[in-house]
């Protein structure tokens, strides 16, 4: 149950709130716009946090289909949340908690529980004020101790699910001083066939927002190119905002360039002026130099990495993509990710993988595509291709070793083949009596002890790491001695649970039961991903050397 407020909220605290809504269509990039604004304010010296409102009835994102919703992002406290919170963490450099994700399921559940326990003293429980009050409470609690809280409202203005939230924001603005509240509306500005930027979708979206009682202070136009001056003027006229409050957010090749783009537009300066705050004595150029150097760092090499999974929606593996990108920044490597569908590669997996310089097998659930993942792991083991297995990828590396190295042909995971005579992967003991699905896995940050003088110790530069987990199955303790009889070893453990595996007969073969991608940041890349790319680079250098030597011999 959510914690109760420490004290009655005092609006005179002067905390600033930026509410980000979206119009015309979903998937416009509200989250990136919100996160980029937060990055710029953080650069200016403010303590910034973020809240994501998801108007669905699910309590959290844990049971949602990755095809529809993208990846389930895991927070340090075990919260299973929308992938936008991953963007907030990566842009702001802050670890969020479950309190930073507000869902209709959470809110209604809490209010109904209070009604059942008699907290409302016989009152008729309604959307207004009980649901809206709970929404406002959650936002204020998440913002505690910060200077600025950015709140993104999921979905599109006009969606029936979002109505209680927009009403709560209207009340919020009524309760706070006007200089403490700013509404940013992100909208689509498409091109017509004759190349004209069309403002009508934006006008209608703002009209819908105003009908609810909300007037945007800032309009951000998502478009393929920057908004023309005439377009900005037209939007300003019909949407009743100053021309100086209309900003472009054009398409970019790399989302980490968005803060630089909107800074050039002057959005951060406008926000600070509108909220009546003064940035620290840091010049605009100086406060973005570090971020600019980071995201524009020159790449000195390039690699192709095969990502072997079953969800063909890129967002389903967003954190893995971003972690590879972060590792590329640190190692100055241009990383091209090649999608390999594990469900369709059985007959031609060698052709698909031969072109890859390294292979990543990410997490997932269910039996579909497992045979393809096992083939990919076998290929990497036999051909000395750098391999990184995450969660399910770690478990399948254990299964592949048992089947093809130890000769247990029927070995498998009890999750995928319950009748297997050799369940080398079995359910966690504490999961035996669990009958519900949501929020019941082993979740969140846990510490792993690493054996010294191992690949894992070199990767983490130490003998302890803390990473985030999301799993219900583990390596079966009864098979550990058998599994370690060959070149495979478990070099990381947590309370007798196997957390990291590696192979002594391979240049780089690493598997982790945890998800290191969830803690990766642009300025603090995940150690397993950095070491993986370094190994890929080294392997390429060795191949190049062998080719050169071979050519010299032929000459």
Curated annotation (Swiss-Prot):
Domain Glutamine amidotransferase type-1: start-end pairs: 307-542
**Activity control note:** Allosterically activated by GTP, when glutamine is the substrate; GTP has no effect on the reaction when ammonia is the substrate. The allosteric effector GTP functions by stabilizing the protein conformation that binds the tetrahedral intermediate(s) formed during glutamine hydrolysis. Inhibited by the product CTP, via allosteric rather than competitive inhibition.
Report the catalytic activity.
UTP + L-glutamine + ATP + H2O = CTP + L-glutamate + ADP + phosphate + 2 H(+); L-glutamine + H2O = L-glutamate + NH4(+); UTP + NH4(+) + ATP = CTP + ADP + phosphate + 2 H(+)
Q: Which InterPro entries match?
A: Class_I_gatase-like, CTP_synthase, CTP_synthase_N, GATASE, GATase1_CTP_Synthase, P-loop_NTPase
Catalytic activity, EC: 6.3.4.2
Pathway(s) served: Pyrimidine metabolism; CTP biosynthesis via de novo pathway; CTP from UDP: step 2/2
Which residues does the annotated region (Amidoligase domain) include? 1-277
Question: Any idea which positions bind Mg(2+)?
Answer: 84, 152
Gene3D superfamilies (alphabetical): 3.40.50.880, P-loop containing nucleotide triphosphate hydrolases (3.40.50.300)
Q: Where does UTP bind?
A: 26, 198-203, 234
Q: Which residues are listed for ATP binding in this entry?
A: 27-32, 84
Q: Which UniProt keywords apply?
A: ATP-binding, Glutamine amidotransferase, Ligase, Magnesium, Metal-binding, Nucleotide-binding, Pyrimidine biosynthesis
Q: Where does L-glutamine bind?
A: 67, 364, 392-395, 415, 472
UniProt xrefs under SUPFAM superfamilies: Class I glutamine amidotransferase-like, P-loop containing nucleoside triphosphate hydrolases
One further remark on this entry is: CTPSs have evolved a hybrid strategy for distinguishing between UTP and CTP. The overlapping regions of the product feedback inhibitory and substrate sites recognize a common feature in both compounds, the triphosphate moiety. To differentiate isosteric substrate and product pyrimidine rings, an additional pocket far from the expected kinase/ligase catalytic site, specifically recognizes the cytosine and ribose portions of the product inhibitor.
Role according to the record? Catalyzes the ATP-dependent amination of UTP to CTP with either L-glutamine or ammonia as the source of nitrogen. Regulates intracellular CTP levels through interactions with the four ribonucleotide triphosphates.
Which protein are we looking at? CTP synthase
């Amino acid at each position: 149950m959510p914690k109760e407020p420490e004290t009655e909220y005092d609006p005179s605290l002067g905390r600033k709130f930026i509410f980000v809504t979206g119009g015309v269509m979903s998937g416009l990039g509200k989250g990136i716009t919100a996160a980029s604004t937060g990055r710029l304010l953080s650069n200016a010296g403010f303590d910034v946090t973020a809240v994501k409102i998801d108007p669905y009835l699910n309590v959290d994102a844990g049971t949602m289909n990755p095809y529809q919703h993208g990846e389930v992002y895991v927070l340090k406290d075990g919260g299973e949340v929308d992938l936008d919170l991953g963007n907030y963490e990566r842009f702001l450099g802050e670890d969020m908690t479950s309190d930073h994700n507000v869902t209709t399921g959470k809110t209604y559940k809490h209010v109904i529980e209070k009604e059942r326990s008699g907290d409302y003293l016989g009152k008729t429980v309604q959307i207004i004020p009980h649901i809206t009050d709970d929404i406002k409470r959650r936002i204020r609690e998440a913002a505690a101790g910060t200077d600025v809280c950015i709140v993104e409202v999921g979905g599109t203005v006009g969606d029936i699910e979002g109505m209680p939230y927009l009403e709560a924001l209207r009340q919020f603005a009524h309760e706070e001083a006007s200089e403490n509240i700013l509404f940013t509306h992100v909208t689509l500005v498409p091109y017509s066939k004759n190349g004209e930027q069309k403002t009508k979708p934006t006008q209608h979206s703002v009209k819908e927002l105003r009908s609810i009682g909300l007037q945007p202070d800032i309009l951000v136009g998502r478009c393929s190119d920057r908004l023309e001056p005439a377009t900005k003027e037209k939007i300003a006229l019909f949407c009743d905002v100053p021309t100086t409050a209309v900003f472009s957010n054009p398409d970019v090749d790399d989302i980490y360039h968005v803060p630089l783009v909107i800074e050039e537009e002057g959005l951060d300066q406008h926000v600070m002026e509108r909220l009546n705050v003064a940035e620290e004595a840091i010049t605009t150029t100086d406060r973005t130099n570090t971020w600019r150097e980071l995201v524009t760092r020159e790449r000195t090499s390039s690699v192709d990495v095969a990502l072997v999974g079953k969800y063909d929606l890129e967002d389903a593996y967003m954190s893995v993509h971003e972690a590879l990108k972060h590792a590329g920044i640190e190692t100055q490597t241009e990383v091209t990710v090649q999608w390999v569908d594990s469900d369709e590669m059985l007959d031609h997996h060698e052709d698909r993988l031969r072109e890859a310089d390294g292979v990543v097998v990410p997490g997932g659930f269910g039996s579909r595509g497992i045979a393809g993942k096992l083939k990919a792991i076998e290929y990497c083991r036999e051909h000395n291709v750098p391999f990184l297995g995450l969660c399910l990828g770690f478990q399948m590396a254990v299964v592949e070793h048992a089947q093809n190295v130890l000769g247990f042909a029927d070995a498998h995971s009890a999750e995928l083949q319950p009748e297997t005579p050799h369940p080398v992967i079995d359910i966690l003991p504490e999961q035996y009596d669990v009958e519900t699905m949501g929020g019941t896995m082993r979740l969140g940050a846990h510490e792993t002890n690493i054996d010294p003088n191992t690949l894992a110790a070199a990767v983490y530069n130490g003998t302890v790491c803390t990473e985030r987990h999301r799993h219900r199955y583990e390596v079966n303790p009864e098979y550990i001695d058998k599994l370690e009889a060959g070149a495979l070893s478990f070099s990381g453990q947590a309370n007798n649970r196997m957390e990291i595996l590696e192979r002594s007969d391979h240049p780089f073969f690493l598997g982790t039961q945890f998800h290191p991608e969830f803690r990766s940041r642009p300025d603090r890349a995940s150690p397993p991903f950095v070491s993986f790319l370094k190994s890929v680079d080294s392997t390429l250098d060795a191949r190049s050397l062998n080719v050169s030597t071979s050519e010299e011999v032929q000459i």
